[in-house]
């Protein structure tokens, strides 16, 4: 006798039909696991989705914002952030995975998904071999809202460790604006000059805004 999905608890439904069979509310129920003394988990899931319909913008919510939802305490807020980060990393690795031939366009588009909306400035390097295949992606700096003080030695320390022939730098502007600052331009020039001395090429430096990216090479700041 077949069991009706409508009569199953969400976890039972996952076991029989897979997680893809769940509605958003059921999926949230499974993730949250339990409610509170006064609120069943189903109600907490409903309130989560009222705040973030279709889970939209959930990955950008901080711990304070998540805890404003009744029924979500510090532990559940941390778990939700961890799940969002896991999802983000899986999505990035679908294209920015090791061995894939990278280009500025591909890296820029993928990094928009991962860095747009972040409130802290981050500097990353995508290290490549002689065929432009990805060797490693490394976060070099996590800064404040208005400053980034990464040093070229960090960039090249990892380039040497990974035996990289080339790399693409990426950093985000929390303001969402794409225009490079004087600091961005000067830092890029220092990196290019150091790379020429070491025989490790900086292919590009990408700035990630709210929905677009800017290539400093295309803007003429990187010259071979």
From Swiss-Prot:
Name the record gives this protein: UPF0758 protein LCA_0852
InterPro entries tied to this protein: MPN (IPR037518), RadC_JAB (IPR025657), RuvA_2-like (IPR010994), UPF0758 (IPR001405), UPF0758_CS (IPR020891), UPF0758_N (IPR046778)
Keywords carried by this UniProt record: Hydrolase, Metal-binding, Metalloprotease, Protease, Zinc
Any one GO molecular-function label of the UniProt entry: metallopeptidase activity
Family membership noted in the UniProt record: Belongs to the UPF0758 family.
Source organism phylogeny: Bacteria, Bacillati, Bacillota, Bacilli, Lactobacillales
One family name in Pfam for this protein: UPF0758_N
Sites where the protein binds Zn(2+): 171, 173, 184
Domain named MPN: residues: 100-222
GO BP, one annotated term: proteolysis
Motif residue range(s): JAMM motif: 171-184
Coiled-coil boundaries: none
Organism: Latilactobacillus sakei subsp. sakei (strain 23K)
């Amino acid at each position: 006798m077949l069991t009706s999905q409508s009569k199953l608890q969400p976890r039972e439904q996952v076991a029989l039909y897979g997680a893809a069979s769940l509605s958003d509310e059921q999926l949230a129920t499974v993730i949250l696991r339990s409610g509170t003394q006064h609120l069943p988990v189903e109600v907490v899931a409903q309130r989560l989705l009222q705040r973030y319909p279709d889970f939209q913008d959930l990955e950008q919510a901080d711990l304070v914002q998540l805890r404003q939802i009744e029924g979500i305490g510090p532990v559940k807020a941390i778990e939700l952030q961890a799940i969002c980060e896991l999802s983000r990393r899986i999505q990035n690795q679908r294209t920015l995975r090791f061995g894939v031939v990278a280009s500025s366009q591909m890296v820029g588009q993928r990094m928009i998904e991962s860095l747009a909306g972040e409130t802290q400035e981050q500097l990353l390097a995508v290290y490549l071999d002689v065929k432009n295949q990805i060797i490693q992606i490394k976060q070099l700096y996590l800064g404040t809202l208005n400053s980034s003080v990464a040093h070229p030695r960090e960039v090249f320390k990892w380039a040497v460790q990974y035996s990289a022939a080339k790399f693409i730098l990426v950093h985000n502007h929390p303001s969402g604006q794409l225009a490079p600052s004087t600091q961005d331009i000067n830092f890029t020039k220092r990196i290019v000059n150091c790379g020429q001395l070491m025989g490790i090429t900086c292919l590009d430096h990408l700035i990630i805004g709210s929905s677009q990216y800017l290539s400093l090479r295309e803007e003429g700041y990187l010259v071979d």
